[in-house]
């Protein structure tokens, strides 16, 4: 709860700072001057007050509350700095931002219209459910594993912003794929362990011949991993934290391994330990590893893991797939898509939901 208040205060101050810039630059252009600036600023601040009022209530506010409370708050955090930067560029370019400056008004209108269009595209992208089908080719694949179908779900981030309808759509897509094995690679919940209940409500009953396996993500750790762990096991999932289990398909024995997450403090049971994860796997054993954070892949690859499934990055929620670029690319060695090293492969799932702002483009 303290962390929630701290984040809320930071965002409130961020909002105020952005609106000081916006007001100072664009006040002469806006009809009504400072009064209009204050009204617009209040529309951005009001949702944060509503979020305070919502503390302690059910993790699932109504659709109407999500519409006026959660969405405007996060979109404001995304677009306010863009609007402020736009104003600075306008001044630097010498646009006449005086009260009678027609060019300034046109520029403001075009900028606001462009941002509104971008917001709609991003919102549509965040609501869109995409099923990606990939063929994974492995050298010297045991014959018994040929054609095995794995469904990976990652980064659902179930929380106040998540609709049950969306969760039902995801569950239906998983069933339709008729997988041999289901891998849930972390961040099942967003901020609160209690949100594992609506997650369980949507996915209880999912099954696959080889099993349903889940691992922790950083948000599961933040929310309280012990409670999330118990909730996942209660719905019949096999939870893997720094351990591997043997499975058999068509007479071929192989291993599914799951790591902890770097969000866990060193020495805690949920902190990643690759050595312990693979301790039970023989040197010749074919292994599929589940690791929420792709930063763990190099260590897994060094130990001969054939395939690693990760998530975490969301591809930065803004990406240009054809160029292999995402908003996360400048910050992460492995940010999106497929990677290969010394016979080991990594696939990074873009995530089944969004984090924070309901905005995704190209992801």
Describe the role of every protein-language-model region:
Residues 1-127:
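Non-catalytic terminal accessory segments
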Residues 25-26, 120, 136, 256, ...:
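Generic structural hydrophobic/aromatic packing signal, biased to beta-strands
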Residues 67-74, 136, 151, 169-172:
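Short amphipathic alpha-helical coupling elements at transmembrane boundaries
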Residues 102-146, 150-152, 158-163:
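Canonical alpha-helical transmembrane segment with a positive-inside/aromatic-interface signature
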Residues 141-363:
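Soluble catalytic domains of enzymes that build or remodel membrane lipids, polysaccharides, and related
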